[in-house]
A protein has these predicted regions:
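Conserved catalytic core of the tyrosine transesterase superfamily
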Residues: 1-280
């Protein structure tokens, strides 16, 4: 019904090197908006957006969902319709800056011990070792692991920029065992056993949840807790926030400062917290 509009959005978004997932989200948001207004494109005004977003807010949706709608419709109005858009008149919804859940080192060890599948264990260890997002660990390739430099190369992450992060000795040991016992993959590091393609995010989230339950973790945890724990444990060891920001791939310092404070160390000699777990 709106295919021509979606094609215009895709074209404009591709020129700006936006990710496919972002483009899909924009099209979905615009489709919801257009279905709600039921107006001809030429008759749309910013008042229509205000009414739509106000109704969404009153329905009790989360700030994240509200802002997804906002971003997609804003892009549509500014880049496709070439209409003025005042962020003061149609603001984004402020999010609660909640402290993220952080796992202790003992809890992470327990989760690893409760993970019988070697591939799953290697993925959990890798996420904690370098603070990886689920989408980043699923898209790792064999060549992204540097045994010499003890680094993990994250390609085309969420911010559309490459970075390097830490590879713990303990993680390398687990990865080596996994590699030799699970087919010695030379392309995708953690391929699906069924398709040979990238694992889905949902499958990783599911097996991590099952491992946490087997480990007896009582708090509500997610795979993202490994990333938060990586950053928090680095900070506790004295690592400067700007280096943690770089390792996480955060462009906005506020994304890191939600759970960290400034310290005084340099990147030289920084160890992954996985290498400092000892007997905890």
């Amino acid at each position: 019904m709106y295919e021509e509009i979606f094609n215009q959005i895709r074209s404009a978004a591709n020129k700006r090197n936006l990710k496919d997932s972002t483009i899909h989200a924009y099209c979905t948001s615009v489709a919801h908006f257009l279905n709600h207004t039921a107006k001809d494109i030429d008759a749309l005004t910013t008042d229509d957006v205000d009414i739509f977003l106000t109704e969404k807010k009153l329905s009790g949706i989360s700030p994240e969902t509200y802002n997804h709608y906002h971003s997609g419709i804003r892009f549509f109005y500014k880049k496709i319709l070439k209409m003025n858009w005042d962020d003061d008149d149609i603001p984004r919804m402020k999010r609660d800056r909640k402290l993220p859940a952080v796992l202790t080192k003992a809890e992470i060890s327990a989760i690893l011990d409760a993970t019988p599948n070697l591939k799953h264990k290697a993925m959990i260890a890798t996420m904690y070792s370098g603070g990886l997002r689920v989408s980043e660990v699923t898209h790792l390739h064999y060549d992204d692991i540097s045994r010499t430099n003890k680094t993990i190369h994250i390609r085309d992450g969420k911010s559309r920029s490459d970075r390097y992060t830490l590879l713990a000795d303990r993680t390398l040991e687990i990865l080596t065992e996994y590699w030799f016992q699970c087919g010695r993959p030379r392309g995708i590091l953690f391929p699906s056993s069924w398709t040979g393609d990238y694992l889905t995010k949902d499958s990783v989230i599911q097996f991590f949840r099952e491992s946490a339950e087997r480990a007896g973790i009582q708090k509500h945890v997610s795979t993202h807790c490994l990333r938060h724990s990586f950053a928090s444990h680095l900070f506790e060891s004295g690592c400067d926030i700007k280096y943690i920001q770089a390792l996480l791939g955060h462009r906005d310092p506020k994304s890191t400062e939600i759970y960290l404070h400034v310290s005084n160390k340099t990147l030289l000699g920084i160890k992954s917290p996985f290498d400092e777990m000892g007997g905890e």
